[in-house]
């Protein structure tokens, strides 16, 4: 047995339901457009009452059951769901500049070029300073090398001088140990009058004898004080000569002593020159 079909709805009921769905959709679109265009204005309230031709007809439950499900479904689906209003996004804030205006690209590029120019200038000045220091160090090195070479030359010269000095000092004979040139001899400090009195006293008691024998002691007695004075003079001259001429030998000093002639007084006019040897090794000419 086939189910009985529902009776077809009345045409007036179909048109009224479609008009109601269109009105609801139109109100929703208008409200959304007003909300987006004027967010601060309050949303207009829907009218409390609708015109009689817009109001849906109230039908009995029997009539509602007889509505075509296709029409009722399209009316329900045609109305979009109402979404809650979304808050409007706040405008983006500009970056914080802390009281300074943001620099443009051209100004920043100019500042970069100026900084690069200053850096190049500092680099060039530092390089020039380093080059000057290198030149100064090279000059000091050359001067040090010259002083080093001169030092070696002076050392060789000093060694040569020391060698020659040692060779020259080896030729000078050493003084005897009993002679001190810095202090005079004590036995030769007697004055000339004392020597004359001593000679006169020794000549008084001489015995008489032949002429040649008497003349010889008188000559020896007269030569005695002169020999002492001459020996003293020769010792002094020898000391001065050794200090002034360290490179000369004893022969030179002997020749100088032989060139000096002894002093003679009235009693020694006819005396002959005699040579005798002193204890100190120096030749004596009388």
Swiss-Prot record:
Putative transcription factor. Disulfide bonds: none annotated. Residues 1-10, 41-54, 81-92 have a biased composition (Pro residues). The keyword Ribonucleoprotein does not apply. Residues 130-161 are annotated as: Leucine-zipper. It is found in: Nucleus. Keywords: DNA-binding, Nucleus, Transcription, Transcription regulation. Residues 102-165 form the bZIP domain. Residues 55-67 have a biased composition (Polar residues). One of its GO terms (molecular function) is transcription cis-regulatory region binding. Residues 1-120, 197-286 are annotated as: Disordered. Belongs to the bZIP family. Residues 103-126 are annotated as: Basic motif. It comes from Aspergillus terreus (strain NIH 2624 / FGSC A1156). This is Putative transcription factor kapC. Residues 26-40, 108-118, 198-222 have a biased composition (Low complexity). Its main location: nucleus. The keyword Transmembrane does not apply.
């Amino acid at each position: 047995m086939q189910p009985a079909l529902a009776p077809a709805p009345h045409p007036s009921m179909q048109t009224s339901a479609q008009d109601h769905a269109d009105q609801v959709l139109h109100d929703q679109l208008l409200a959304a457009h007003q909300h987006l265009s004027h967010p601060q204005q309050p949303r207009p309230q829907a009218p409390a009452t609708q015109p009689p031709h817009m109001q849906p007809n109230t039908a009995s439950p029997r009539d509602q059951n007889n509505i075509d499900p296709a029409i009722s479904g399209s009316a329900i689906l045609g109305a979009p769901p109402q979404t809650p209003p979304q808050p409007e996004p706040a405008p983006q804030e500009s970056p914080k500049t802390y009281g300074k205006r943001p620099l443009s690209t051209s100004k920043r590029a100019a500042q970069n070029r100026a900084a690069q120019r200053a850096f190049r200038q500092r680099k060039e000045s530092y390089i020039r300073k380093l080059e000057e220091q290198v030149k100064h160090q090279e000059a000091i090195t050359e001067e040090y090398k010259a002083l080093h070479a001169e030092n070696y030359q002076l050392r060789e010269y000093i060694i040569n001088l020391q060698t020659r000095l040692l060779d020259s000092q080896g030729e000078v004979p050493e003084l005897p140990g009993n002679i001190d040139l810095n202090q005079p001899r004590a036995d030769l400090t007697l004055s000339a009058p004392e020597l004359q009195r001593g000679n006169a006293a020794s000549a008084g008691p001489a015995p008489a004898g032949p002429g040649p024998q008497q003349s010889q002691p008188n000559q020896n007695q007269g030569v005695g004080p002169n020999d002492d004075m001459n020996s003293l003079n020769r010792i002094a001259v020898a000391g001065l000569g050794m200090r002034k001429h360290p490179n000369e030998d004893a022969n030179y000093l002997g020749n100088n002593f032989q060139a000096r002639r002894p002093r003679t007084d009235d009693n020694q006019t006819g005396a002959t020159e005699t040579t005798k040897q002193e204890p100190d090794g120096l030749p004596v000419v009388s």
